Amino acid sequence: MHRFRFEVILATVFLAAFLFANHYLNPGNKLTQAEVDNYISRLEQAPVPKAELAQMIVHMRAWAEADDGKPVYMLNLMRYYPQLLTLPEVAGFQGSPVEATAYDEEHVAPILFGAGGYPVFLGAMQGTLQGTASSSNLMAFDPAVDNGNSVLIIRYPSRSAFFELLTDPQYLKYLPYKVASLLVALSPMTGDLILPRLDWALGAGLLILFLAIAWIRALRRAA
């Protein structure tokens, strides 16, 4: 047993890392009513135009109260405004909507990762027509759904993690830059088929690394 002490310790460390990642990325806890009320109360202070915020609160509360404790994949369909909307929080910003969005994302990314969320897909619309008859779609040409600019899908380990991000004071500090720069359709989705899952990919990587190290050490012993 002493001969394989290093391998046993390494396997224990890797297993602990995998179990931690699995728990962190899949907590499985449902929101309580008290937690929902707390998040909604904090969300009511968000720097979003009042009429839009009121509608958003209704949808957010209903979704939070229907929590199933499972991870959620948040679809962001984004379309830039021709120019920044006039909001007091971004009055001093000198830049385009694209630059304002990049500024927001630069500061929000650490908060997102801290909450356990991470992007699984980001892509720009290719566009099919340009000029005055511009279009991003091959089907469905209603102006309400056409001419999008990009799609982003973010995985959250739980609805609680999403609300932790959304109500974080630092996140709210930069939210006006996103509100002023683009129209976002935010749609929560289930992950019926996602390849690969990050925690299992990590587990596979750790297993391969462990076997490689054990093999190298075995060769050295035999030499």
PLM feature segments, named:
Residues 138-189:
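Extracytoplasmic/lumenal ectodomains and periplasmic regions of secretory and membrane proteins
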Residues 2-146, 191-223:
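Short S/T/G/P-rich N-terminal loop/turn motif that feeds into the first structured element of a domain
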